[in-house]
């Protein structure tokens, strides 16, 4: 199991009388501490102690700006206090008298952490005056006045209350990240004010907060609304390009050794100050922690380290699937004489601020969800970060003192491989879920919806087609009763479709654990250490064997049921190398999905079906109802080809129980694809062709344009234009033909033929005469 957090260094020095033992110092329990250590706190009206922030000098002006404008853009450097202080100011100014102050975050970790921080500052219990809501977890009450939530949760609020009558202020935070849901919220809020709905609250205010973004463009989108700039307080940060990655290495992400080397060089050669390292995901982070620990263990602190006050290195991972308690540790001061090193995903670039960071190691890459048009699927890829993201990362080193940023890539990589800004998610991912949401909000014209950056029309039409294939919309593009039910589920449409199909057969118990497991982080622990790795793989194979050894979906169900039924689930997870936190989340998800299904089945018109057959067949048939777009047939050897019309080759991922059994298979369905050296299908199960025979034609039978009223109207107009042009060409051809016919008729009468013959004989006689004259001259 993971040994981190852990301290690598020499044995602790003898404890002096009155000195605290070396441990994480939790005398300041706040979840996030941003203020400078030397500055004194100030007391809020709620009685809590609040650190000093740059935003405090702008408090009165900022409150007045919110009062005076329906839309306001607030910009300032990360750490200026926007996220934690502005909602408090508005609460203390009385805005919550007209409704809640809602604050969105793109990530649930940030929503929870910031809510904890603000609740501590306001001296209240989390869930009372200050609460949060993330997917599958609502920690709020009727008393809640400030509610932090993911942007997806606000979208769910709009589904039930399009006029947002329960809110007085909506704050869209971290707008520069341009998530898909945030962009949709931009359009919905703009439309809410444009339509001037009679039920809209007059007091509703919208604040958009961004650290780095095209502010003029955003202001123009919201009717040239004012931009309120909070002057920053950043210390200078020196940048160093380490030149370990160049433009040719854009596709090569095997850079862990380089990251660890640079980090260790900082620890040995730089003065005291904590280190923040940016990597792309959990596997890279855990591997780097292990390698860094091994190197730090061999350091002689009497000779190797330039700063003699240092006795060790505290290594702390930070990624989304960690527990809240584990995440809290990264914000606590390290023990005396110990340097803290946080190895994190991109979440620490903007959403969270860690005090004491003086050195940043920028790995230059991030995991990003991109739509692959060749496969017709969204794929999580490792790509270079943007220049704006790189500046965000380096800014973390200049929060409390001057700092340094070590970029492992070269200047050429910066200029040639890194875009200026983040590509908005709406322009690079599937739109299926949000298009369904818009349809359920009676926004039928999804093509001309007010987007800040309009997505490619192809992505919209593809989303419409997928919704039709799931029976969420009809051939006219109108949402169906099933579609209205599907939008209530916090699942992708295809997975929701499979769950509802199972419910109609009264076998939802088979699908709900699987749906819950697919909704959380990867549950399998795959350690870096080779010895532990073999043990983990053996345990995972045993679990797959209990599910029949031939169905990855069923393996997830077995893990869910066995862990839940064990007397000590945490110990069971440790024994089987499974993430207990992920399983615990899956239990909560399954309970909420079960409640949604219960309410759905109470409806009088809910369809009921019967099927006589073994459970394993019912399970796979229900999966086919939602995953028939992800059907593949074996072509040659171990290669499969998708059946969606693209015929893309895919291979079964090595982690699957079906890996190396490909020759026994003919047809499969899969949950997702992963692109590395090959295109791999993950979470796979075998099926029979007859189960999808009637479903596959839906992938091809309808033109996507038919599902959009606007597209249909444009197609009709285009068809009329083409028909008119065709008729004009036809008439032109007819006119030409008639003229040619007249000429032919004139040429074919007796007189014309006689005249033509006479002209031919005359020309022939002339040629004979010319030839005779030539012979005489030469003779």
UniProtKB/Swiss-Prot annotation:
A motif (DEAH box) lies at residues 173-176. Residues 1-53 are annotated as: Disordered. Residues 42-53 have a biased composition (Polar residues). It comes from the Eukaryota. GO terms for molecular function: ATP binding; ATP hydrolysis activity; nucleic acid binding; RNA helicase activity. It catalyses: ATP + H2O = ADP + phosphate + H(+). CDD domains: DEXHc_DHX40 (cd17984), SF2_C_RHA (cd18791). Residues 13-41 have a biased composition (Basic and acidic residues). ATP binds at residues 76-83. Its EC number is 3.6.4.13. Belongs to the DEAD box helicase family. DEAH subfamily. Probable ATP-dependent RNA helicase. This is Probable ATP-dependent RNA helicase DHX40. It comes from Mus musculus (Mouse). The lineage of its organism: Eukaryota, Metazoa, Chordata, Craniata, Vertebrata. The gene is Dhx40.
């Amino acid at each position: 199991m993971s040994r981190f957090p852990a301290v690598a260094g020499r044995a602790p020095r003898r404890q002096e009388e009155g000195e605290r033992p070396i441990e994480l110092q939790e005398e300041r329990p706040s979840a996030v501490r941003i203020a400078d250590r030397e500055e004194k706190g100030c007391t809020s009206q709620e009685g809590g102690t609040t650190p000093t922030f740059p935003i405090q000098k702008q408090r009165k002006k900022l409150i007045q700006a919110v009062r005076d404008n329906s839309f306001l853009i607030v910009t300032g450097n990360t750490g200026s206090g926007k996220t934690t202080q502005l909602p408090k100011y508005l609460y203390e100014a009385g805005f919550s008298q007209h409704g809640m102050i809602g604050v969105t975050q793109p990530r649930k970790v940030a929503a929870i952490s910031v809510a904890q921080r603000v609740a501590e500052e306001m001296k209240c219990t989390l869930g009372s005056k200050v609460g949060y809501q993330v997917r599958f977890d609502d920690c709020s009450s009727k008393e809640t006045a400030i509610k932090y939530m993911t942007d997806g949760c606000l979208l769910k609020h709009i589904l039930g209350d399009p006029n947002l009558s329960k809110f007085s202020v909506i704050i869209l935070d971290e707008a520069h990240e341009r998530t898909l849901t945030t962009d949709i919220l931009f359009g919905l809020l703009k439309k809410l004010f444009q339509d001037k709905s009679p039920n809209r609250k007059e007091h509703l205010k919208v604040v958009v907060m961004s650290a780095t973004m095209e502010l003029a463009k955003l202001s123009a989108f919201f009717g040239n609304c004012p931009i309120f700039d909070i002057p920053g307080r950043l210390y200078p940060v020196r940048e160093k390009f380490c030149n370990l990655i160049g433009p040719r290495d854009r596709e090569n992400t095997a850079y862990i050794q380089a990251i660890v080397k640079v980090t260790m060089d900082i620890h040995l050669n730089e003065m005291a100050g904590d280190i923040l390292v940016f990597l792309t995901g959990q596997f890279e982070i855990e591997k780097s922690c292990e390698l860094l620990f091994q190197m730090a263990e061999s350091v002689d602190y009497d000779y190797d380290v330039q700063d003699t006050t240092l006795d060790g290195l505290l290594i702390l991972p930070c990624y989304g699937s960690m527990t809240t308690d584990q995440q809290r540790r990264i914000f606590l001061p390290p023990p005396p004489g110990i340097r803290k090193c946080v190895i994190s995903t991109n979440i620490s670039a903007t959403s969270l601020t860690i005090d004491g960071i003086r050195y940043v190691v920028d790995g230059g890459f991030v995991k990003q969800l991109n739509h692959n048009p060749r496969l017709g699927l969204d794929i999580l890829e490792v790509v270079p970060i943007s220049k704006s993201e790189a500046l965000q990362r380096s800014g973390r080193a200049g929060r409390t003192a001057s700092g340094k940023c070590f970029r492992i890539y070269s200047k050429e990589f910066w200029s040639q491989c890194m875009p200026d800004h983040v590509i908005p998610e709406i322009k690079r991912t599937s739109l299926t879920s949000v298009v369904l949401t818009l349809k359920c909000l009676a926004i039928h014209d999804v093509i001309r919806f007010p987007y800040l950056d309009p997505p490619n029309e192809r992505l919209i039409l593809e989303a419409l087609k997928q919704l039709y294939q799931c029976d969420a919309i009809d051939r006219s593009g109108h949402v169906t009763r099933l579609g209205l039910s599907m939008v209530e589920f916090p699942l992708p449409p295809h997975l929701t479709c499979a769950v509802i199909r199972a419910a109609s057969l009264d076998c939802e118990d088979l699908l709900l654990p699987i749906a819950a497991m697919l909704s959380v982080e990867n549950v399998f622990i795959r350690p870096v250490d080779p010895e532990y790795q073999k043990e983990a793989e053996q345990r995972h194979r045993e679990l797959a064997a209990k599910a029949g050894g031939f169905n990855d979906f069923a393996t997830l169900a077995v893990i869910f049921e066995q862990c839940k039924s064990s007397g000590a689930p945490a110990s069971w997870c440790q024994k089987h190398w499974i993430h207990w936190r992920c399983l615990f989340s899956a239990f909560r998800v399954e309970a909420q999905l079960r409640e949604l299904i219960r309410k759905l089945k109470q409806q009088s018109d809910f369809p009921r079906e019967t099927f006589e057959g073994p459970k394993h067949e019912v399970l796979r048939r229900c999966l086919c109802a939602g995953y028939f777009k992800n059907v593949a047939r074996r072509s040659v050897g171990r290669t499969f080809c998708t059946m969606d019309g693209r015929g893309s080759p895919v291979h079964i991922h090595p982690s699957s129980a079906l890996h190396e059994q490909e020759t026994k298979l003919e047809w499969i369905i899969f949950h997702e694809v992963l692109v590395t050296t090959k295109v791999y299908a993950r979470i796979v199960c075998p099926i029979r062709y007859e189960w999808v025979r009637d479903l596959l034609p839906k992938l091809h039978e309808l033109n996507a344009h038919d599902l959009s009223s606007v597209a249909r109207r444009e197609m009709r107009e285009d068809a009329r234009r083409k028909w008119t042009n065709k008729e004009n060409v036809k008439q032109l051809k007819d006119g030409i033909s008639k003229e040619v016919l007249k000429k032919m008729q004139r040429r074919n009468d007796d007189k014309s033929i006689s005249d033509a013959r006479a002209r031919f004989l005359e020309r022939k006689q002339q040629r004979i005469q010319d030839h005779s004259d030539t012979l005489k001259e030469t003779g």
